[in-house]
UniProtKB/Swiss-Prot annotation:
The keyword Chaperone does not apply. Keywords: Electron transport, Membrane, Mitochondrion, Mitochondrion inner membrane, NAD, Respiratory chain, Translocase, Transmembrane, Transmembrane helix, Transport, Ubiquinone. InterPro entries: NADHpl_OxRdtase_5_subgr, ND/Mrp_TM, NU5C-like, Proton_antipo_N. Core subunit of the mitochondrial membrane respiratory chain NADH dehydrogenase (Complex I) that is believed to belong to the minimal assembly required for catalysis. Complex I functions in the transfer of electrons from NADH to the respiratory chain. The immediate electron acceptor for the enzyme is believed to be ubiquinone. It is found in: Mitochondrion inner membrane. The chain crosses the membrane at residues 1-21, 31-51, 52-72, 82-102, 112-132, 135-155, 175-195, 198-218, 237-257, 264-284, 291-310, 321-341, 358-378, 387-407, 440-460, 468-488. One of its GO terms (biological process) is ATP synthesis coupled electron transport. This is NADH-ubiquinone oxidoreductase chain 5. The keyword Signal does not apply. The lineage of its organism: Eukaryota, Viridiplantae, Chlorophyta, core chlorophytes, Chlorophyceae. It comes from the Eukaryota. It comes from Chlamydomonas reinhardtii (Chlamydomonas smithii).
Amino acid sequence: MFLLSVFFPLLGGLVNTSPIARFLGHRGSSIIAIGCMVVAFISSVVIYYEVVFMGCAVSVDVFGTWFSVGTFHAGWTFNFDLLTANMLFTVTGVSMAVHMYACDYMRQDPHLNLFLGYLSYFTGFMCVLVAADNLLVMLVGWEGIGVCSYLLIGYWSHRLSAVKSAQKAILVNRVSDGLLMWGVLWVWYHLGSLEYDLLNVYSASGFVGLSILIGAMGKSAQILFHVWLADAMEGPTPVSALIHAATLVTAGVYLLVRLHIHDEMFVIIVGSLTAFMAGVFGATQSDLKRVIAYSTCSQLGYMMVSLGLGETGGEASMGHLMTHASFKAALFLAAGMVISGNGGNQHIARYGGSAHSAMFTMLTLMVASLSLIGWPELSGFYSKETILNLAAICADPIADVAHTLLLLTAMLTSAYTTKLFYQCFMVDFSGSSVTPVRNVLPILAMAILLLDIMLKVWVGTNLLSGMLFFLPWGVKTLPFGLMVAGILTATAAVGSERFTLIRFCGSRWGFDQLFARSPVNPIFDLGRITWAIGDRGLLSVGNLRA
């Protein structure tokens, strides 16, 4: 039962990418993909019950010794502890909803079986990463989700923008992944083992901790490595939902929690700058999916700040990761319905007037948006408020600055989320009419999970009771006040040039231009020179001699 949650998504991917899939048709491929994900999710629920409620952590040796090099023996072992159980439940639950949604959303695509196969592989490798008991098996899942993200972002290969975005994502992650690999090799050289138990103390210091931290920054799109995240929206909407909710971008945060890497100063600085930067970018975007993408980047910044606040911060970070998975999946799936109903148009300034014709979509997007901004009695409120409270009580000047930046980010989040919702449904525009996708069950499930009542069912108590530790009245109420201020500001400024900040912010602070002019273009120029002088020259000389 424990292995089903890991291997069944991979099985679904194997079937749908094999020659057998051409005989299954769209219906057969959909049944295979959804069926495998349902089995994986049910297995994850059983694991969650056994580990969380019964306290039965399990370690499963799958293949024995994978390979041996001298005294080093690599084992293929999965460890199902509390952290793994929570992550598997989140990953398989969100992925099952995305698979159901994708079967309907992509029903006109001639290669639906291939798309579903890539989605299943994506989920399967994420489950391998989550359940891995050592760094070597973790790297298999880590590289697997990287390859799958490249295939899915560039799935519409007839679009040049999609191909370039896929290349950008894989190249940026190659830089951070290279440092992660170097750190793993360093650990193997000095310890002779890659087991997590030995790493929890060793990897938290020095070069190893920094290299693993930078590897996590790349996957989780932190500042300097964030440039690929918004461009990844060129892929189909189900891909965006899966990347942002439960798989790729959460892998970095999970790895840091797993290895207990909490370099307080560096992590807090990186997380707070990322959160604020992404908040500014989100407020200056007009593309629906890019606005949601920058909200993901911003929330990942919250999680990174929380990681720098000690062991309690690690727990708060994982709590926010789980709630974020639900409301971000609901946001993207509802956004997909809006986009499909507007003929593929993603420019929110051209939306509006569809509140009556798309009531279900409007309500779903509203609940998910309120959870994103941290409205009371929704799941996002509890997880975000916990992080803000931890930053407020931390006796460190850097934490005080981070707390201020997170508060400003909360205001920006409220502003651009209100702008998005208002432009989609409240502005009169006769050309907008959303046609709901037939399969609304996945979105409904994600929206229900955002309600506090469902959290009480799962946890067994009111989460608010665990948050009532003493804090000054102003500290507790300031986030809510800033959230309301952001909503009012956005409502007053929608449709006005005042809401469009300076062009510098709209161009994302010039990071793309900076990277293009400094490391990227010179490398491309060098490649063209070596091709012209070396490859083409040698080949032409060889042909003449022949």
